[in-house]
């Protein structure tokens, strides 16, 4: 009989800071739209169970090392990305611009998520790798475009000058476009023969939907139109829309695609969709917190950029302490979606939620 995940064996008690505020009602709208209730942390009482930062269980029987797992998966993804890009040829500049951003490192959270989910439902790394690389290509494309002067006007990304600072705005736009096209080409060509055609079509549709006007693009549009708005005139519903679409949508797609490629059941796919939606929002809440609590050197990108741009963020809307409470609750709700899966196979995903909530960059 399969062993199920026990949250208590991956828990660490963290005392919530400050007093709980029971006056925020608009946060509850998220549960209606997503089937989740991450913001219910705003009305919670007492301490919360959290996972240790390195993803290691407090249970002496568990030897899972998430840090090592993450390093190994990142190495596999980096190697696959390196060979996925065609050899340099004319026009050289755009090829160099593509490689500059795609191979700049990073935590590779999205491809790791795709692979871990595929393995959880019975697949393997080889089956998921092309899709995982496609997700990272699209993520990198979105970062290149997001950093442009007409968008966020950022100078640093992953500790290096942004693409347009090195290659110019025109070449950065084209590099982002090229990565977007390469993602779908790579995913479909490399996976041919590994995955049934109907599953591949479903995965492609899932990914396309996540980055179009029903996903990432929609989030970016609302994000840009919300700059300089008075936070007192904007509810949490607008902020949650931005983050559900701009950040969570691609993480959700990474998980769902991994489940599809691995042959997951409909029930498994939906549970993992909810899990990814939780960690997607969690990722952005933590990102908002880090933007106002860490330095540029620590983040590898310009700290305080969102504040300077007048963007809507969780700390700006509900304060730093309540933002931490929301992050804490999201991590717990993500873990809850993994109940019923084999504990050994689910361990990377349990630890990933912890890693995102505890990350410092």
UniProtKB/Swiss-Prot annotation:
CDD domains: Trans_IPPS_HT. GO terms for molecular function: (2E,6E)-farnesyl diphosphate synthase activity; dimethylallyltranstransferase activity; geranylgeranyl diphosphate synthase activity; metal ion binding. GO terms for cellular component: chloroplast. InterPro entries: Isoprenoid_synthase_dom_sf, Polyprenyl_synt, Polyprenyl_synt_CS, Prenyl_diphosphate_synthase. Binds 2 Mg(2+) ions per subunit. Pathway: Isoprenoid biosynthesis; farnesyl diphosphate biosynthesis; farnesyl diphosphate from geranyl diphosphate and isopentenyl diphosphate: step 1/1; Isoprenoid biosynthesis; geranyl diphosphate biosynthesis; geranyl diphosphate from dimethylallyl diphosphate and isopentenyl diphosphate: step 1/1; Isoprenoid biosynthesis; geranylgeranyl diphosphate biosynthesis; geranylgeranyl diphosphate from farnesyl diphosphate and isopentenyl diphosphate: step 1/1. One of its GO terms (biological process) is carotenoid biosynthetic process. Residues 24-58 are annotated as: Disordered. Coiled coil: none annotated. Its cofactor is Mg(2+). Mg(2+) 1 binds at residues 146, 152. Its EC number is 2.5.1.-, 2.5.1.1, 2.5.1.29, 2.5.1.10. Mg(2+) 2 binds at residues 146, 152. Transmembrane segments: none annotated. It catalyses: isopentenyl diphosphate + dimethylallyl diphosphate = (2E)-geranyl diphosphate + diphosphate; isopentenyl diphosphate + (2E)-geranyl diphosphate = (2E,6E)-farnesyl diphosphate + diphosphate; isopentenyl diphosphate + (2E,6E)-farnesyl diphosphate = (2E,6E,10E)-geranylgeranyl diphosphate + diphosphate. PANTHER family: FARNESYL DIPHOSPHATE SYNTHASE, GERANYLGERANYL PYROPHOSPHATE SYNTHASE 11, CHLOROPLASTIC-RELATED. Monomer. Catalyzes the trans-addition of the three molecules of IPP onto DMAPP to form geranylgeranyl pyrophosphate. Belongs to the FPP/GGPP synthase family. This is Putative geranylgeranyl pyrophosphate synthase 8, chloroplastic. It comes from Arabidopsis thaliana (Mouse-ear cress).
